[in-house]
Amino acid sequence: MTTTYLPKLNVPGPPLNPILGRLPMILRFAKDSIGYARPLFETYGFVVSMTAEGGTNIYSPLAKCPGTVFTCGAENVRKVTSQHEIYYKYPLTGNMFRKRNDSPRTEPLKHFGVGLFGVNSGTHRQHRQLLMPAFHKQRIDSYRSDMVAITQSVLEQLTIDKPVDIAQVMRLLTLRIATKTLFGSDIGEEGAKSGQILQEVSAMNGNLAIAFLPFDIPGLPYHRLLNLFAQLDDEMRALIRRKQANNTDDGDVLSMLIRAQDAETGLRLSEDELLGHTGVIFAAGHETSANALTWTLFLLSQHPLWAQDVVDELQSVLKGEAPTIEQLQKLPLLERVIKESMRLLTPVPWNGRVTSQATELGGYELPKGTEVFVSIYQTHHLAEIYPEPEKFNPQRWETFEPTMFEYNPFSAGSRVCIGAGFAMMEIKIVLSMLLQKYRLQYIPNQTIDRFGLIVMAPKNGIKMIVRKQDYNFTQGVGGVKGNIREMVELIG
């Protein structure tokens, strides 16, 4: 029998636990990836391994991995996000599907979560070209009326002077928008079940039991996950076939993807590919936007002067109405606030890759198969790029024009998020309508901790009292506990 040895990962990092080995490091990273990695960057520099001994594998679908490397800084971001033939993307489903788990029950995992995140080289270029028409500006602009109607519906359900978990409200709102624009169905309508199942799948992200106990046994989260993917597979295939039979553009993203065709080759997306792309688009358009909105509303609740200036701008331009497409371009302060929020509290803090061949990064040799995590969050908090990096200062964006490798909440290079324009329009519409109508007052003495690996969300939500927009922005400032204070300067 021939024994295969993994190549040695010679990148600096902390030593193994003498008793438990790599396990404590993996658990700490899974519990709080930002809190785990930040001191490593401070100690070892911009390229650091999870452990100097290598052999870790956090998310890669590869059964064998030389180790996990974290990196940050504009030059390293440029290398990893630009050298596509060296740094491959892998599916959103990550290590939930590996060859050792191959079975009919795991078959749907091959399709969902793949999309543009899980294809590389020529296939990625070809698929991105097919998807682009669904995200051209004219097409995105056509979703404005649905976004406004759904936002208005959700806002009308809020009760004045009553507390709400604003994170939960934003998840519901973006779920409805994603379901309507992607599938053509709002919650409660035919076809919306796919969106509801996808939300439950997203909620299982970060469940350690799935990674450590990938066994299809009733009672285990992995078993529940496979059940959800089986349901989703059935629902989505039925929806795709109904739309194919109708052979019409219903105005939603899925309808357009079904009809997409390469002008030169006549190539269309297969049913499996449609499943993969819709899963990725839904996740990106739902969880990411929900967290960006939640963090922005929290930051405004703790920075009353900026909150007042933003509401003044909104009232001056919109006069209490929902924004038109043209008016969205006339809200410069709102855009700066969103940019600063997504810099400080990056909704997607990591960008994962795996090396397809041996390569060099930051002066270190990385073997083939090395898992590489680019820290978007850490790059956004480097003082050499952003003076006073923990300070919420939208004014910095009046003159500062970073490169795409210094500021990349939507990734960078040719793999920049295809739905970035959609997300920014959605966030602007929701904030402009909400802030004109309500003032959200933070309830003091909550513990606000970050949570998540793919996306960063408040672990226990954020409770706020819904007030009429009365301009009393100083109410509810202060009394914030938790590791949020490591990420942003706060009063009190």
Enumerate the predicted regions with their spans:
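N-terminal membrane-proximal hinge/A-helix region immediately C-terminal to the signal-anchor transmembrane segment
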Residues: M1-P108, V119-G122, Q126, S145-S153, ...
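Cytochrome P450 heme-thiolate monooxygenase catalytic core
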Residues: T2-K8, K89-P104, P108, V119, ...
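Cytochrome P450 I-helix active-site segment
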Residues: L6-L16, R144, V148, Q196-Q199, ...
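Cytochrome P450 proximal C-terminal region
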Residues: V11-P14, F41-E42, T151, Q196-V201, ...
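Conserved cytochrome P450 K-helix E-x-x-R motif and the immediately C-terminal K′/meander segment
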Residues: P24-V48, D234, A238, E321-G362, ...
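Conserved cytochrome P450 K-helix/beta-meander segment immediately N-terminal to the heme-binding cysteine loop
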Residues: E85, V374-F400, G479-G482
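Cytochrome P450 heme-thiolate "Cys pocket" and heme-binding signature region
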Residues: K110-G113, F117, G279, A322-E326, ...
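Cytochrome P450 catalytic-core helices
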Residues: T288-A307, V311-E313, G421-Q436
